[in-house]
Amino acid sequence: MTITDLVLILFIAALLAYALYDQFIMPRRNGPTLLSIALLRRGRVDSVIFVGLVAILIYNNVTSHGAQMTTWLLSALALMGFYIFWIRTPRIIFKQRGFFFANVWIEYNRIKEMNLSEDGVLVMQLEQRRLLIRVRNIDNLEKIYKLIIENQ
């Protein structure tokens, strides 16, 4: 096993740990989930570049008769990238005392101001940061608003 294979195993393990945390652990942290809403995905250009570069590496490894272990590891990395970028949907998860947005816990008392933009983006102003929440279904904005008003 080469150093390249070890690095690939490390990256695959990191992506797998992130996927498991995002899917199974985060919804169970900080109490029961009151509301979980699907968000719009950001641009997919980065993901296309990543999966394309991994596909080029697989092609190079196969055509140069590289190690089969490396080919399998690159394929696993491409599948993990495909899952994280295209199959998994980003979510905002509301709890009793706060919410998870982009895998970061934010308590309700940190919200200083809330606005709704013309194009349906909920803007939350925190102490030093502004959150732009783009929901997939525009009707979910009312649910978010009611939940935050009830819990503040």
UniProtKB/Swiss-Prot annotation:
Keyword Cell membrane: yes
Disulfide bonds: none
Entry keywords, A to Z: Cell inner membrane, Cell membrane, Membrane, Transmembrane, Transmembrane helix
Topology of this chain in the membrane: Multi-pass membrane protein
Taxonomy, superkingdom: Bacteria
A Pfam entry, by short name: DUF986
Localisation per UniProt entry: Cell inner membrane
Protein family membership: Belongs to the UPF0266 family.
This protein's name: UPF0266 membrane protein YobD
Organism per entry: Salmonella dublin (strain CT_02021853)
